[in-house]
Amino acid sequence: MKQAIIAFLALVGAVALVGGGVMLWLNRPGRTAVSVNGRILTDRELTWRAQTLIDDAKRMENLLIPEKEMPRALEHYRRLAAKMWIVKEVLLAAAVESGVKATAADEKSSLEAAAKQLRVRNLTPEQFFKEGPIPEEVKRSDFREAVLIEKFTKREIETKIPFGAKEIEERTRELRELNAKTTKPGQPPRYKTDRKSVLEMIRQEKYNIAYRNLFRERFGKVTVECPAYPDLESVDGVSPPH
């Protein structure tokens, strides 16, 4: 759930302000930047989402961008936001096609998780939904979509991740050997080797692989057009092969 909530927080909200407080629009802010199965994200909306990522990095990671570097930074984050939006739309289409439904209880649970994420940003969910130029109803729609995607990926991935006792034992042994080789006197070991930590490490690795494979499979079933970044019309542009 944490991954879906973080993605949701990154994709919506924020004011499209660039260095010096100047509003930055492209020449045609209403033109299509990205389209997935006919669902359109305009240049203006893409800039909003890119600025969200910049603002969050400034707030949470102390990102400092010199004013003269802002155009380059904005372009970097616009491209990242385009990728994130494509991933969201591809998985949303898959979730809708699968017939999975998000209930009011699902949304309530996700909202509680979002509240914890927002707390470190000194925001409540209501403040987050209402602030910025993006209409509140659009933000709430994005949130509901994130909940649906989370429920779909949990069903398709999390509940199907296999674990074996031998695999856990081997990973625990490997981590202990690494700790013995890399831990300096007086320092704590680099890797946790309790069963819970080892299980989580294996689970996360398998989840990441399965998530990526699911996305690449579903990408082939949608139509992606990206005038802003044409290379993102290919699955390898969004999710490069290993």
Model-derived regions: residue spans:
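Ordered, soluble secondary-structure elements with a strong preference for glycine-centered loop motifs
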Residues: 101, 122, 162, 201, ...
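Amphipathic alpha-helical coiled-coil segments
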Residues: 126, 155-156
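Small-residue hinge/turn detector
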Residues: 90, 148-149
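Short, low-structural-confidence N-terminal segments
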Residues: 1-80, 186, 193-242
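N-terminal targeting/tethering segments
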Residues: 25-143, 166-170, 182-186
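Acidic/polar surface patches and capping/hinge elements
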Residues: 131-140, 156-187, 203, 212-224
